[in-house]
Amino acid sequence: MSIKLKQRFVPQLAAINCQFEEDFAQMLKTVDTSHIKEKTVVKGQVIEIKNDMIIVDVGLKNEGRIPKSEFLSLPEVGDVVEVFIEKIEGRNGRTILSREKAVKEELWGQLEIMCSKGEFVDGTIFGRVKGGFTVDLSGVVAFLPGSQVDVRPIKDPTSIMNIKQPFKILSMDKKLGNIVVSRRVILEESRSEARDEMLSKIKEGIVLEGVVKNITDYGAFIDLGSVDGLLHLTDISWGRVNHPSEVLEFNQKVKVMVIKFDEKTKRISLGIKQLDSNPWDAIKEEFPVGKKMTGKVTNFADYGVFLELKDGLEGLVHSSEISWLKSNQNPRKMLTIGQEVEFIVLEVDTEKHRVSLSIKQCQENPLIKFAENNPIGTIIKAPIRNITDFGIFVVLGNNMDGMIHEGDISWEDNGTDLLKSYKKGDEIECKVLAINFEKEQVSLGIKQLLPNPYQKISDEYKKSTIVKAVVTEIKDDGLVVLLNNKVTGFIKRVELSDEKDEQKPEMFKVHEEIDAKVVSIEKSTGRVLLSIKAHKIAERQKTLKEYGSSDNTTNMGDILANVLEEKK
């Protein structure tokens, strides 16, 4: 009686067709399975498919189970497949196998060969990680550093994701399971030859077609195929362009002219506006200085407003040329975008591509009319518009203001204190003091309505006059004195003597009478400023002049001593 044996799968015997079980059993005894080790790839036979598991026999005592999910295409019973042996005998006695790891082992080996030969591998970028991207190399995940993505920074990485493309393996570490790849190396190699060929054809003046590759604040980079060129902001249009994104967009096809090519640095400068004739060539004839025209407000700036002269051409109205009397006001508060206004051409600079315009010069200067009706010295009445720390602003009509400085409120009292006695809306009487057409200012005064009480003092105490004064107060910075018992004077410390060590106020006494020279009169207070030093210097010069022709043997000190003695 023969014994029925289970036919165990043995790779070495898989191709042998045994007719008798006894023969198979005998041959099985001679097969050595010691070469089958853990963490290796071996061949096995599918012996059963049960639910979601594939049962595989690799020639060991026990079969192994592999989830169906590990197979890209499901095998059939009897098929021979390569599997990875995780463990020869697991907890439940079964052999632990993996189809997925077997595939990866096979791929890893192929990748190692390609890496050693420097061959490119196909892969797909499918995810982003810190510092770069993940790439699927037909089942093996590799790392693509951000620096190895492209020859230039990519603004939109999604444009290169989920697309099968070639990569070069930079390094492999099987122990750690790490693979680092590069896309940039391939691009550099492929672009190098094409770049050299393209650069050999580049000449200033030729027209090319390109694609907007990147947009910056200062311009746009245009991909000309294998080389890039810079389209500067100022070379996009003859008109004003604030930012390239106003007229260009990513991946837009454009026609450009090579306006400069540096053969040493290989830098290419491009232009779009150069494809058209320069509108500035005939601008002076079209917009002569002094011509009155109309245009629409197109844009505002901190320093003025831009008006459209014609398509693609604008002129600037400086803030000071918008209104006669509101030169410091924000242009946005006086005009609106799209508003049509009348202007006069002031200047055309074809080299700098600038046209200066004026809105206010289309109108009569209201200050001229005011000056005709109110010459200097005219007394007017005007309501208070505003009060500040330094004076009062009053309404003169036609959006004009006049200013009364705090120093022009009163001859005697403190102007800053008097400001508190006025309020907005009060109508006050004042005199026109000055009209400055250049600064567009009208200066007014209240105290000028009355005679200057200090004028009499100025008439009585002329500059350089020698006067007698009595010390009434001693201060650290000088002496307060009284002239003729009615007018206050002051002598600064430095004016007390021509000798520095005698410039001490404490050397004088209250009620002491002194001689001094009038230096000046403070118009705001009527205080007379005096100098003892100037008086002494004048006396010395006078003495030298009188006695300068004396006997040369006479000592000058003796002369001065005698003069001083005579004056006692």
Swiss-Prot record:
Coiled coil spans: none
One annotated GO molecular function: mRNA binding
Record's GO cellular component terms: cytosolic small ribosomal subunit
Keyword annotations from UniProtKB, A to Z: Repeat, Ribonucleoprotein, Ribosomal protein, RNA-binding
Segment forming the signal sequence: none
SUPFAM superfamilies in the cross-refs: Nucleic acid-binding proteins
Positions of the S1 motif domain: 39-100, 118-184, 205-273, 290-360, 377-447, 464-533
Gene3D superfamilies per record: Nucleic acid-binding proteins
Transmembrane stretches, start-end: none
InterPro entries per the UniProt record, alphabetical: NA-bd_OB-fold, Ribos_protein_bS1-like, Ribosomal_bS1, Ribosomal_protein_S1-like, S1_domain
Matching Pfam families: S1
Any Gene Ontology biological process: translation
Keyword Repeat: yes
Protein family membership: Belongs to the bacterial ribosomal protein bS1 family.
NCBIfam families, per the entry: PRK06299.1-2 (NF004952), rpsA (TIGR00717)
Function: Binds mRNA; thus facilitating recognition of the initiation point. It is needed to translate mRNA with a short Shine-Dalgarno (SD) purine-rich sequence.
Protein name, UniProt field: Small ribosomal subunit protein bS1
Origin species: Rickettsia prowazekii (strain Madrid E)
Gene for this chain: rpsA
